[in-house]
UniProtKB/Swiss-Prot annotation:
InterPro entries: Ribo_uL30_ferredoxin-like_sf, Ribosomal_uL30_bac-type, Ribosomal_uL30_CS, Ribosomal_uL30_ferredoxin-like
Subunit structure, as described in the record: Part of the 50S ribosomal subunit.
GO cellular component, one term: cytosolic large ribosomal subunit
Family: Belongs to the universal ribosomal protein uL30 family.
Disulfide bonds: none
Name of a matching Pfam family: Ribosomal_L30
Superkingdom of source: Bacteria
Full protein name: Large ribosomal subunit protein uL30
The encoding gene: rpmD
GO molecular function terms listed in the Swiss-Prot or TrEMBL record: structural constituent of ribosome
Keywords recorded for this protein, A-Z: Ribonucleoprotein, Ribosomal protein
Species this chain originates from: Colwellia psychrerythraea (strain 34H / ATCC BAA-681) (Vibrio psychroerythus)
Biological classification of the source: Bacteria, Pseudomonadati, Pseudomonadota, Gammaproteobacteria, Alteromonadales
PROSITE patterns in UniProt: RIBOSOMAL_L30 (PS00634)
A GO biological process held by the record: translation
Coiled-coil residue spans: none
Length: 61
């Protein structure tokens, strides 16, 4: 079984007052609150979501 590469994403800023699409993107990434960290598979779709809300999250490879 092949180990897939993962990426850790942490929400740094609040989603209050942000664009509805950006709030939905955070929800899609599984982020719920400030300092919440999730580990996701490193795929092009996940990277695209991260790029959309780059100013609210921190990414660790």
């Amino acid at each position: 079984m092949r180990m897939s590469k993962t990426v850790k994403v942490t929400q740094l800023k609040s989603s209050i007052g942000r664009l509805p699409k950006h709030r939905a993107t955070l929800k899609g990434l599984g982020l719920r609150r400030i300092n919440h960290t999730v580990e996701l598979e490193d795929t092009p779709s996940v990277r695209g979501m991260i790029n959309k809300v780059y100013y609210m999250v921190k990414v660790e490879d």
